UniProtKB/Swiss-Prot annotation:
Subunit and interaction comment: Associates with the 50S ribosomal subunit.
UniProt name for this protein: GTPase Der
Domain of life: Bacteria
Lineage: Bacteria, Pseudomonadati, Pseudomonadota, Gammaproteobacteria, Enterobacterales
Key words, A-Z: GTP-binding, Nucleotide-binding, Repeat, Ribosome biogenesis
Matches recorded under SUPFAM superfamilies: P-loop containing nucleoside triphosphate hydrolases
Cleavable signal peptide: none
One matching Pfam family: MMR_HSR1
Amino acid sequence: MIPIIVLIGRTNVGKSTLFNVLTKTRDALVANYPGITRDRQYGYCKLQSNKKIILIDTAGLDIKLNEIEKQAQAQTLIAIKEAHLILFLVNARDGLMPQEYEISKNIRKYQKKTILVINKIDGINEASKINEFYSLGFEKIQKISASHNQGINTLINRYLIPWISEKFKKKITENLYKDTELKKIAIKVAFIGRPNVGKSTLINGILKEERMITSNTPGTTLDSISTPIKYNYENYTLIDTAGASKKKKKINDFQRFSIIKTLQTIEKSNVILLIIDASLQTCHQDLSLADFIIHSGKGIVVVVNKCDLFNSVELKKIKELIKSKLKFLYFSKIHFISALYKKGIFQLFKSIKESYEDSKRKISTSTLIKTMHIAIKKHQPPIIKGRRIKLKYAHLGSSNPPKIIIHGNQVKYLSLPYKRYLINFFYKTLKIKGTPIQIQFKDNENPYVKNKN
């Protein structure tokens, strides 16, 4: 069993900053706005002597306003139940707030070991402001500044390592290697799309639990949230992301960070599910996202959600329209589903696995050369300045995505339509599905040209 530690506190006390410092990542979204963290965010923290813990970042416990914030608090309470240890964060600059008496009272109901962490101590000269936190009645207290990395080593060495050694003993090292192995082979699947297309609802449907906060309000998900799952003996990591909305004249910093994190998630993932709302017209934003995914070289599966809103005749028209607009994604599977009613959602895994395996496929040089020669025989390259462009041989430059390098003479003069013809021919002949192929052309240099100069 791996120790689980949860970060609890009011909004804007520095929970996400401490999460990023301890996990040595930037997985948690950090901004100077209250209520940015909503869903539970999990991360690994590696300590000395191969000790490893799971850290959970949570939403602030002091907001009880709208439906989204109520769901965020429910997620936080689930995290407290899962955890073995609570790090209760408070803000030294704000001083002791009335809500913190209420939070400490609620924490004690769970009878979990708790460490009070007084954050943002940098620049605080008034000892009275810090001392008033002792009235909360917690035995173990640590003063830190997460943003300046002050007191973090003391927190780890004085409290976390001794607690793990005492409670979990030998099991930690054993689990470290098991989890590292699982993590290596997990297929990372990112759920990408415009706001309110049903990304979080789809993940909840697959997990068969309310793991992600959902609502009819666009922009409910602000951060990229990863969740591990095992399906048909395969390990997957499902990553929910913030919706990539249309360009606006005014956007907040955290909205800008959310979009950046979504694009970074695409780069880090193996396969992308591009979610499209069947009730809305396929717009420029959907096409831009598809184009970005193709250029990032990631496997792509198109998912058209909310098909339950239409009858068979209407759905047939929608299918034809979407297929027409996305014809440049001819190598990808298109699934028509209803995430809300869980129709067609588990068929996605077959396309995800197919896309992942084809992106890592090793293709022999002889197969590529043979395929290239058949393509040339069917349709020869154009003649430039009285000489025909010659394609001599091809080989695999890299995989994930497959990158084919073709060598020849005057290849820089190849037209875009002929390059497209070659890519399409490789797709059909090699039967590659769900992943983009990249082709690079290299001119053979004439060794005598340099000697003449």
